[in-house]
Amino acid sequence: PRITIQIEPREPGAAPYPDPNRVPDVTAEPERPLEPDSAAAWFWSVVSPQIGVPGRYDQAIAHLSEAPQTRDLRLPRFEDLTAIVQAHGREILASTAGSDVSAAFVLAVIAVESAGRVEVVSHAGAQGLMQLIPATAERFGVGDPFDPGQNIAGGAAYLSWLMENFNGDPVLALAGYNAGEGAVARAGGVPNYDETRDYVPKVLATWLMARQLCTRRPDLVSDPCLFTTLVSG
């Protein structure tokens, strides 16, 4: 049968899409102090945090799928992922349509960043579903970070930029999303911050769950995903 997806158009007055010709300032992210080894040291003992490691994504996914420690990452529940899709799935699809970032990957980031809470603000000032700091929101054309459509569009655009900037490496892209791309560049890989070293495997493990909500399971974070609950026909 023919598959159709109903995606609502962007409302008049919404923040514009980011200018692809604008080069973000990689020094804009704040410095964070170096921290001791994270609770996810078991993950990094197998997966190299350094820049330029081929095959890292496959290695990370295999390790997360097999290691018993994965269950200790305090992952979102599958029911939470489903609820986010029901509430914001159309905005996620609209923001990832035609991009190199899977809707399931964006879903995983939302689940870890905010648990689907639209108006949450972190202690560091990150805002909304994808926890955009004000400077990042401005970079990617987000006028109202508490508007779900704008926030998701900005976060998805930032993920896409990070994937391109780090040559399609999801591990470095996630590290950049959490710590800032400048921190990744300065560290020569995933910075040795507890928060970042825990964040990367947590999002990747959540991605393994999120892709189960797609009509066809994506293998790569760049593969397309249509959420089963939004498919008709």
Model-predicted regions and their roles:
Residues 1-107, 201-233:
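Cell-wall glycan-active module
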Residues 71, 75-83, 92-97, 118-123, ...:
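Second-shell loop/turn segments in exported
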Residues 100-108, 146, 168-176, 215-216:
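Surface-exposed patches in mature extracellular/periplasmic domains of secreted proteins
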Residues 103, 116-118:
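Extended amphipathic alpha-helical interaction segments
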Residues 110-115, 154-158, 168-194, 199-206, ...:
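Acidic helix/loop microenvironments that form the catalytic cleft of cell-wall polysaccharide enzymes
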Residues 120-143, 154-163, 181-182, 200-203:
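Substrate-binding/active-site groove segments that recognize
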